[in-house]
């Protein structure tokens, strides 16, 4: 399942991750995989108001993976596709597995 959610980007020089954002969480963390939607759940403390959740997502990914991100799709949706710039698929999968799944 994780190989369907995480894939190499052809034009962004990074790794694409399909995520579902759960805002207003107690802490920022990687959650489980939503198998029905085929998305990795990311829990974020910020509310989705005025782009605050998207900024929090960028900070969280920078802290977790040490890489910058681009929100490729879903800027105003809880379902997003994120590109982790300069990362490898194995690197991302290893860090996700170590963090929670």
Curated annotation (Swiss-Prot):
Name the source's superkingdom: Archaea
Task: Give the matching Pfam families.
Answer: DUF167
Entry-linked SUPFAM superfamilies:
YggU-like
Q: Which Gene3D superfamilies match?
A: YggU-like (3.30.1200.10)
List, alphabetically, the InterPro entries matched.
Answer: DUF167, YggU-like_sf
Give the GO cellular component terms, alphabetically: cytoplasm
Q: Which residues form a coiled coil?
A: none
Family, similarity comment: Belongs to the UPF0235 family.
What name goes with this protein? UPF0235 protein Maeo_0841
């Amino acid at each position: 399942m994780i190989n369907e959610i995480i894939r190499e980007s052809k034009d962004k020089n990074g790794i694409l991750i399909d995520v579902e954002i759960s805002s207003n969480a107690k802490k920022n963390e990687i959650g489980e995989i939503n198998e029905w939607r085929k998305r990795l759940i990311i829990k974020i403390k910020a509310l989705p108001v005025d782009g605050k959740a998207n900024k929090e997502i960028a900070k969280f990914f920078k802290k977790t993976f040490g890489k910058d991100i681009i929100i490729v799709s879903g800027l105003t949706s809880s379902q997003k596709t994120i590109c982790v710039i300069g990362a490898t698929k194995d690197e991302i999968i290893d860090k996700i597995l170590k963090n929670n799944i």
